[in-house]
């Protein structure tokens, strides 16, 4: 557990100020470990199953400190002594630190999956949003150019960059529909769940720009919604790939990964279920001439 980082610390609690929610059955989020610190007094603590049945009870003191509470483990504070003083911290792995601290969406799973193939250099995050992928790539040693059309998203990312003293992310407001050109050269260019929000005539010129701006042996990663017979594209998406269309654009590249699997959008239907869509996912490496 030595590699966990505290991203949030609550004020010191007394017997009068421990929130009721922590005395009821609850659990931590995925990827979040909780750590109670006892400064004085005693605290009775129970680990529970999902049904609320007690699995084990423990008495914690300044001499007998609680262990880390694992992500999504059910638990509650049973009781405390009148003189209790304790503090709760939330911790995570280094790669989740900035996302948790600043309440960003997690780094895209395909970025994480591509990491073993990447070896630093310069990266371009096309449609970076608030920076969930750019921040991760900066932690991996990349010099990152982060582009987005939304000034509010870029402002949030710039605030994080300033607060954390990050030197290797450079934000730029770009409207790719009016100008898809890429003038620099990069070892990794990613565009995850962005292209379906672009005007259809923009996408193929943008991909051509991504390809020419990629160094030999560099990688492109694209994830984009598809329009298929079994699951038509969402009506408000200006663009979607047809079957095999994205892969065909990378003829002559080393296709490391390609699939058209069903995934979920963040939006939900009338029943509250996340909407499913086929996604074209491609990780490709540029080969020498």
Language-model features: locations:
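Class I (Rossmann-like) S-adenosyl-L-methionine-dependent methyltransferase catalytic domain
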Residues: 23, 74, 92-118, 124, ...
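A short acidic, Gly/Pro-enriched loop at the edge of an enzyme's catalytic core
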Residues: 181-189
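Short acidic-glycine-tyrosine-enriched beta hairpin
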Residues: 51-71
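Ligand-binding loop in jelly-roll beta-barrel domains
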Residues: 70-92
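Short, conserved beta-strand element in jelly-roll/cupin
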Residues: 34-44
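A short beta-strand submotif of the Rossmann-like class I SAM-dependent methyltransferase core
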Residues: 191-194
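A short glycine-rich, Lys/Arg-flanked "PGG" loop and its adjoining helix->strand segment in the class I
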Residues: 204-216
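Conserved short histidine dyad/triad with adjacent acidic residue
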Residues: 12-31
């Amino acid at each position: 557990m030595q590699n966990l980082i505290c991203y949030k610390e609550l004020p010191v609690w007394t017997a009068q100020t421990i929130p009721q929610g922590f005395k009821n059955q609850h659990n931590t989020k995925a990827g979040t470990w909780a750590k109670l610190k006892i400064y004085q007094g005693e605290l009775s603590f129970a680990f529970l199953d999902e049904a609320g049945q007690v699995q084990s009870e423990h008495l914690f003191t300044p001499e007998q400190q609680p262990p880390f509470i694992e992500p999504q483990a059910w638990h509650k504070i049973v009781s405390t002594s009148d003189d209790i003083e304790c503090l709760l911290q939330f911790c995570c792995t280094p790669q989740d630190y900035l996302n948790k601290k600043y309440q960003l969406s997690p780094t895209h799973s395909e970025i994480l999956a591509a990491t073993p193939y990447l070896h630093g250099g310069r990266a371009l995050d096309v449609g970076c949003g608030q920076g969930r992928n750019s921040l991760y790539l900066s932690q991996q040693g990349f010099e990152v150019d982060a582009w987005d059309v939304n000034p509010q998203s870029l402002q949030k990312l710039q605030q994080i960059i300033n607060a954390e003293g990050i030197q290797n992310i450079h934000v730029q407001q770009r409207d790719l529909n009016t100008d898809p050109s890429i003038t620099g050269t990069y070892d990794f260019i990613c565009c995850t769940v962005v292209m379906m929000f672009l005007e259809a005539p923009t996408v193929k010129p943008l991909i051509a720009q991504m390809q020419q701006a990629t160094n030999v042996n560099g990688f492109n990663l694209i994830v984009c919604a598809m329009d298929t017979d079994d699951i038509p594209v969402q009506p408000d998406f200006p663009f979607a790939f047809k079957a095999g269309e994205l892969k065909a654009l990378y003829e002559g590249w080393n296709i490391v990964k390609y699939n058209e699997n069903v995934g979920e959008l963040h939006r939900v239907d009338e029943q509250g279920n996340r909407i499913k869509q086929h996604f074209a996912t491609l990780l490709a490496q540029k080969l020498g001439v």
